[in-house]
């Protein structure tokens, strides 16, 4: 534990934390950083002013009327008139490259390059910047100097971002229109091969390049700011915990106060047995030490059972208010000890309760209106500290309430108590959990079983909640899973694999995603799943309507018909009567959806209708209002759908998993809503996800998201998700897991949030199985949520996997590979390769319910994105060596500051098309300091993450020994997809499916932990568990025998990793 500072006052109680205050060196560094930012701001302001003056002076009135941009000769004349020296001065003054890049781009582009685009003038840019709401940067926690710098730099981004916005809006409209239509049934062969559009673009997307450059710069800025930032500022939780550590001062002795212990001391033998740590001696002088070392238990001379404070008698296990600092609410704790210290001070030990404001979901950081927490609710913790008895303020009546009570019974139970608690809270992994049943609400080995109010009477007064489920031993059916924002199904697939390893079957019963190709992929690999290609908010409306229909036509519990149905049934005698020519008879209802599949402009409940006497090509979507004259068809459809479980009903879902997209937090976007991220439409899916959880009340919830959810706006969205679960009376636990730690040659860290009904065991996070090459930045505030071993315990980890371990056995393919099914050419070379080639049965994948259609020896999706002619020529000239990239091309010079430039002594080499061999965007990317453009991976390396775009213009994605980008299958291997898992759609869509997926080994490890919890196996109250050795890979004999049909004798030596 990090040492903590001494308290400011002797009488102020302290409670525990793991934070360190800012050092003098850090404060000095921060001051220097602010000064540098101020200087940059002033330089940019002067440069921008001179730029506008030059434009005004050089542009004659009327001469440029109607022109939309400068011609190259105009730019050259202006530069010559002002002199090269002046331009050099401007370059030196511009720390960010946007202005210079835009000048170069404008000088080299022909007027037709932006035909039809609106050119922004300087005054337009200023006007747009002025319209932005003030205080955005300041409210996000930036200093005034940082805010001014961001605002000035942001002016130059307005033009570029405005063009991007238009493109995004068009994409959004197209996507929403596609999603609103009826779900399509796709055949595997419809999108299995390469299409004409599956070719790398001739030039990189300027907006994408700029965004990724800014993101890289943002990472650097975040790392630099963290070096000088005081850990814990601005966080209510950290402020609260910071007050819980410092040892009490011994300036005031017991004789200085009227407060005193009551009665005789506890007999020495009994005291040493109950509190042995207080009397242990590490050295001969331990009893003489006036100040204990940090993390060392304060030593005692003797113990007592009661104390008199302000003429009030306090006993062990009393709940009390404890004096806090100035302008703070009194702390809440439970007395666990009274003792006289070796300094003869009178102390008590207190086990702390946390208010909601003291936790990760503090209302001081999270101001929302869609849910709230009871102000009487507190959470018991394991945190303890020693304080002088004079810090006790008064008693408080706290009731322990059964978390499974109904709201009515809970209200009755807490009506005569000051506060109540039904869960514990721990800062580690931000855990809200049930209290251990064996100690009835007390935590820790020294805590007793007494509580402030008799909760036995409270429990008997009310009715237990309907959330209570039968023990696992009484359940025989396969557990059901709903996968929201499913993508191609990676997370649900991994969860099912891990669940099976724990001895239970979990089936992806339902899945929802807006991407039709991802839905087709999931359906192909999970044929028994009900896969819906629609917006998630429409799915929520649909299941609400479906529940109403089932209540109308079917009784949930016994599947019998309701005694009365509002809509009259048609007379059976009229079935065969001929119909008028202009009337169509409904033969059967095929599907149901909510939305507007017929583009009528009105959302509602629709049925897909098969018309009598017509083939399927005449099927149409009809609103439920238009089917009022055929209620018997609706009844038949609902009865059949209810029996087949086509849609989930409240209380009938075991697990919900999903990764709601929060695109409003991505990138270095100055237009992000720091003050209220939920106001951004791009973050609304998080609310929809929680609304579905609230409606369906599954036993378990697992939400996945990018780590930025815990970085942006002080982790607002992550805190919101946890707050929603706790407000819904779910247990919750937050962790961050990196894919590399679970046996993959990549790092990619993701945030995971467990939720569990109070009647279930809260799942733990599985500890790593492998070492990994650490990349990226962990949010400091949530550093205790990183799932990892302590540094001394890493000896149990396997070696980190490298690129060769994953892909060295795959066949050699060229830049243009049209076949999506080929055969293996060599035997597997590593343990990972042998496992990843296994069939469904050996990997325990039961998505086909026992059948295994895997084609032995067949390899799917081993296709690269085809490079265009220019890029292919460039890639062919990148050397086959470690660390190779565009800097190895002819004509590039690397300066002493690691900045690249063209060699002025030789002519610029050209491609066969006439374009330069070394493109301008590669030289200017990240101010010329990046080594990513046309970078080649190497066998003994790992990748930082698996990308969704396979273009080499600004990322290291070239194969180590072949002149192409990594194939879809190679990327899938890096994500842990078994080779039998087939992707569906155009090549670019397949890259997106793999890149957006949760790494399957991570999901599998989580699934194993979920399976144990589902079985009721808690194994203590630790937040993490160690995976069994047999979990990492299947039994070795089974693996070798079944590796894609290759006999075990032909398995290559594991050390022969590449050709």
UniProtKB/Swiss-Prot annotation:
Domain Chromo: 584-649
Keyword Nucleus (UniProt): yes
Compositional bias ranges of the Basic and acidic residues kind: 42-79, 92-129, 147-157, 252-262
Enzyme Commission code(s) on record: 2.1.1.37
One GO BP: DNA methylation-dependent constitutive heterochromatin formation
Domain SAM-dependent MTase C5-type per the UniProt entry, residue ranges: 479-1017
Keywords: DNA-binding, Methyltransferase, Nucleus, S-adenosyl-L-methionine, Transferase
Enzyme class: transferase
Entry's localization field: Nucleus
Catalysed reaction equations from the record: a 2'-deoxycytidine in DNA + S-adenosyl-L-methionine = a 5-methyl-2'-deoxycytidine in DNA + S-adenosyl-L-homocysteine + H(+)
A cellular-component GO term for this protein: nucleus
Highest taxon, organism lineage: Eukaryota
Protein's job: Involved in CpXpG DNA methylation. May not play a major role in maintaining CpXpG methylation.
Name of the protein: DNA (cytosine-5)-methyltransferase CMT1
Species assigned in the record: Oryza sativa subsp. japonica (Rice)
Gene: CMT1
